[in-house]
């Protein structure tokens, strides 16, 4: 048995899609355990680019069992579009299964998402307006509608009617927005029910049986540790649990099943939307790094804010996830930047500390304390071993390991599958 959890160790967009793709080739089962279509994973197969939002990255390998787990909130419209797009490009999607316990996103969730964000005004949190938060709210309030409800149309229809009555009243009286038509929703979702029925399964049983049979299981996370509902920069976070503990809840396995936890770390730091960002690089230098790294959101297209590597947040990620290894991505983007800066600690009101603060107000006041390292100018995209990398590049990697206390196992030196240096394979 081998169970590996892959998590983002920063604010998401770390390059998890590429690392998941690499590990999926070696896994038997790939399960997505949280989030929704607000996530976007980009995978390069040769010179062909695939952008996935809900379907696990393992779908690009024939014969893999790919599962959308119970911790996901599923927008069936997005899923059907994604499946059709993959089929049109010759990808076999027959290995996909959807948890009957996963919750559904309905049209009114998206309407609420947009209305609530607009209502926040200057305090907006940067939601993608895809209905993720409101769907998780319904789940926590125990009024959510699950994928398994699509199998009982009478039950599904009654639940939608009940929820819609309350939601339409909320939209009208609080947000001064039009409501949604019940019949239109039922007609739309009847089509999804017919289409998705063969894919709906007891995913908890599937994944636990696979582990009992000694198969290799990869738990694919979305977003990142700093977007976790509890461990992230609250309230500028997502509505689920991207950390390793979320894999147990969102896939339905016990914590003793997990063997390794790999944190995906971008060689610099990025974040999308609002919230404090101590190592952010502003002005032309930040713009140049954004263009060099092609830092624009897979889901939204929004430009990402860019900054230097921050090992304060990485130590926090190492602790809350129990990281056993790091997959370092986009190292090639740093080529030509000299010197390089690594944040080793924060200065807060004159005091230097290495801990990541829970208080958003405190984090906004934190000033990064930097250590400078010499950069490199050699092209590293063809490197396939550690020895192929320039000495200053290896020094940067070693310093990351020293400051986080976590060994680097994988290094991405380009977007393609083959542009990966393997120091230790998780499987």
Swiss-Prot record:
Documented EC number(s): 6.3.4.4
Quaternary structure and partners: Homodimer.
Amino acids binding substrate: 298-304
SUPFAM superfamilies given in the database record: P-loop containing nucleoside triphosphate hydrolases
Originating organism: Moorella thermoacetica (strain ATCC 39073 / JCM 9320)
GO cellular component entries: cytoplasm
Keywords: Cytoplasm, GTP-binding, Ligase, Magnesium, Metal-binding, Nucleotide-binding, Purine biosynthesis
Chain's role: Plays an important role in the de novo pathway of purine nucleotide biosynthesis. Catalyzes the first committed step in the biosynthesis of AMP from IMP.
Subcellular location: Cytoplasm
A molecular function GO annotation: GTP binding
Source taxonomy: Bacteria, Bacillati, Bacillota, Clostridia, Moorellales
Cofactor binding summary note: Binds 1 Mg(2+) ion per subunit.
Residue sites binding IMP per the record: 13-16, 38-41, 128, 142, 223, 238, 302
PROSITE patterns, sorted: ADENYLOSUCCIN_SYN_1 (PS01266), ADENYLOSUCCIN_SYN_2 (PS00513)
Record-linked Pfam families: Adenylsucc_synt
Active site (catalytic residues): 13 (proton acceptor), 41 (proton donor)
Family affiliation: Belongs to the adenylosuccinate synthetase family.
Positions that bind GTP: 12-18, 40-42, 304, 330-332, 412-414
Source organism superkingdom: Bacteria
Protein name from the UniProt record: Adenylosuccinate synthetase
Residues given in the record as Mg(2+) binding sites: 13, 40
Enzyme class label: ligase
Pathway(s) served: Purine metabolism; AMP biosynthesis via de novo pathway; AMP from IMP: step 1/2
Obligatory cofactor(s): Mg(2+)
Catalytic activity of the protein: IMP + L-aspartate + GTP = N(6)-(1,2-dicarboxyethyl)-AMP + GDP + phosphate + 2 H(+)
Keyword Secreted set for record: no
Gene name for this UniProt entry: purA
HAMAP family: Adenylosucc_synth
């Amino acid at each position: 048995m081998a169970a590996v959890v892959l998590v983002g160790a920063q604010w998401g967009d770390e390059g998890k899609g590429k690392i998941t793709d690499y590990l999926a080739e070696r896994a038997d089962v790939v399960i997505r355990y949280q989030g929704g279509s607000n996530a976007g994973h980009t995978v390069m197969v040769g010179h062909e680019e695939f952008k996935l939002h809900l379907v696990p990255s393992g779908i690009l390998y024939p014969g893999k069992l790919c599962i959308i787990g119970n911790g996901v909130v599923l927008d069936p419209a997005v899923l059907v579009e994604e499946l059709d797009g993959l089929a049109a490009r010759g990808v076999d999607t027959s290995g996909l299964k959807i948890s009957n316990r996963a919750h559904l996103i309905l049209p009114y969730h998206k309407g609420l998402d947009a209305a609530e964000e607009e209502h926040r005004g200057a305090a907006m949190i940067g939601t993608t307006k895809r209905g993720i938060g409101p769907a998780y709210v319904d789940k926590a309030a125990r009024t959510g509608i699950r994928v398994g409800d699509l199998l009982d149309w009478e039950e599904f229809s009654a639940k939608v009617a009940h929820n819609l009555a309350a939601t339409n009243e909320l939209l009208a009286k609080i947000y001064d927005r039009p409501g949604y038509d019940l019949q239109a929703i039922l007609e739309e979702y009847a089509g999804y029910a017919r289409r998705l029925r063969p894919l709906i399964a007891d995913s908890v049983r599937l994944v636990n049986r696979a582990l009992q049979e000694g198969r290799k299981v990869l738990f694919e996370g979305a977003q990142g540790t700093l977007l976790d509902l509890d461990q992230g920069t609250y309230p500028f976070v997502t509505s689920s649990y991207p950390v390793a503990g979320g894999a147990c809840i969102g896939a339905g396995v016990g914590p003793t099943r997990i063997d390794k936890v790999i944190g995906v770390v971008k060689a610099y730091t990025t974040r999308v939307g609002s919230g404090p960002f101590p190592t952010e690089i502003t002005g032309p230098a930040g713009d140049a790094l954004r263009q060099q790294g092609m830092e624009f959101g897979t889901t939204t297209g929004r430009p990402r804010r860019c900054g230097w590597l921050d090992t304060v947040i990485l130590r926090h990620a190492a602790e809350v996830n129990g990281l056993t290894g790091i997959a370092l991505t986009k190292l090639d983007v740093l080529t030509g930047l000299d010197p390089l800066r690594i944040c080793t600690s924060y200065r807060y009101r004159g005091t230097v500390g290495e801990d990541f603060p829970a208080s958003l107000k405190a984090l906004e006041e934190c000033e990064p304390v930097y250590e400078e390292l010499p950069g490199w100018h050699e092209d590293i995209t063809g490197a396939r071993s550690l020895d192929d990398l320039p000495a200053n590049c290896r020094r940067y990697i070693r310093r990351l390991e020293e400051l986080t206390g976590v060994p680097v196992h994988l290094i991405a030196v380009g977007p393609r599958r083959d542009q990966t240096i393997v120091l230790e394979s998780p499987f």
